[in-house]
């Protein structure tokens, strides 16, 4: 078999080239070409085509049942961002800065889902004992939560087929490894191929799968940009680690609106919902103070009251300077 040659793949648009470019010919971005090993293929498409079979085509009026059956997570703010709950067979990508609370919110959701569903939590970053310690701290006591400490997607796929869980959580996609890819875990090729495998599982078995994704130094999702095109929903968990409040925002949602946000507060026993963000924004605001006012902004279907402050001082420069800062 011929030796595989490395290729250069753009992390933004997925453009592939046999040589390195400083500027991607596909999207025009700079310094986005990374060296990767292509996926090994034992046989060509022409050789495989003889084994393909036709599949019956369904007409739209022949599809019966609830095509958008949703599962509640038990967290109203999370359901709001998802568009009313989890859609069966959907692939959801949850991304955010390290330590922001991605694994925490998903483990808390397992407590409610475990009342009526079997949840499989796959971790490539923590051992089963470490997940148990975090679950005890968060008060997660459900017996319908299976833990699998594994990074090989082939083993994970076979486990899902045998266990037949109702919901699957992958933490995280950057730690998963596909044997057909020669590159290391977290590379562009590995992330893309592993995500495609999980997408196939979700659609074939009707199992909703949550995927935790890391972010790069620029704040974008680590890995190829095509990752966001593969999944059904992209959620960002935002917030400053020095502050206790977190905002869950939907960037892409094939089954709902992307205008909704969810507000949470990080407490000692996990994340708590903030059902009235306006009260949070205006708490402790002094009355009858000059230079401040209350403004109403729309986030999805609900209005939020926020305080706007203005400060004017004399300047020694010829051109006045205008600056703004947002603080939650």
Model region roles, listed by residue range:
Residues 32, 98-100, 125-129, 137, ...:
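Conserved nucleotide-binding/hydrolysis micro-motifs of P-loop NTPases
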Residues 220-230:
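Short regulatory helix/loop adjacent to the ATP-binding pocket of P-loop NTPases
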Residues 89, 97-100, 107-197, 315:
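Conserved inter-motif catalytic segment of the P-loop NTP-binding fold
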Residues 327:
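Conserved small/polar residues in nucleotide/adenosyl-binding loops
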Residues 2-5, 16-92, 114-121:
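Detector for small/aliphatic-rich hydrophobic stretches
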Residues 6, 25-29, 33, 39-43, ...:
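Conserved P-loop NTPase
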Residues 189-210, 214, 230-241:
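Substrate-engagement module of ASCE P-loop NTPases
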């Amino acid at each position: 078999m011929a030796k595989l040659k490395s290729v250069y793949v753009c992390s933004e648009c997925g453009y592939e080239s046999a040589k390195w470019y400083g500027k991607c010919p596909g999207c025009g971005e700079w310094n986005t070409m990374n060296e990767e090993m292509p996926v090994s293929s034992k046989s060509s498409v022409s050789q495989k085509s003889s084994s393909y079979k036709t599949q019956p085509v369904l007409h739209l009026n022949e599809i019966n049942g609830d095509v958008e059956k949703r599962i509640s997570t038990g967290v109203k703010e999370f359901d709001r961002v998802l568009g009313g709950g989890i859609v069966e067979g959907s692939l959801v990508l949850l991304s955010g800065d390290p330590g922001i609370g991605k694994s925490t919110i998903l483990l808390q959701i397992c407590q409610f889902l475990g009342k009526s569903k079997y949840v499989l939590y796959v971790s490539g970053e923590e051992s089963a004992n470490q997940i148990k310690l975090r679950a005890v701290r968060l008060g997660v006591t459900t017996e319908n939560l299976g833990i699998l400490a594994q990074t090989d997607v082939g083993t994970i796929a076979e486990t899902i087929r045998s266990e037949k869980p109702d919901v699957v959580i992958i933490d995280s996609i950057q730690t998963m490894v596909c044997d057909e890819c020669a590159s290391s875990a977290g590379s562009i090729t590995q992330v893309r191929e592993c995500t495609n495998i999980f997408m196939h599982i979700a659609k074939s078995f009707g199992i909703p799968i949550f995927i935790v994704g890391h972010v790069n130094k620029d704040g974008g999702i680590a890995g190829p940009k095509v990752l966001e095109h593969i999944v059904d929903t992209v959620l960002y968990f935002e917030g400053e680690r020095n502050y206790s409040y977190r905002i869950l925002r939907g960037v892409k949602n094939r089954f709902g609106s992307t205008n909704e946000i969810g507000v949470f507060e990080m407490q000692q026993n996990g994340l708590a919902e903030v059902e009235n963000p306006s009260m949070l924004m205006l708490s402790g605001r002094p009355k009858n103070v000059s230079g401040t006012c209350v403004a109403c902004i729309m986030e999805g279907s609900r209005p939020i009251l926020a305080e706007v402050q203005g400060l004017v001082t004399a300047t020694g420069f010829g051109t006045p300077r205008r600056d703004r800062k947002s603080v939650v």
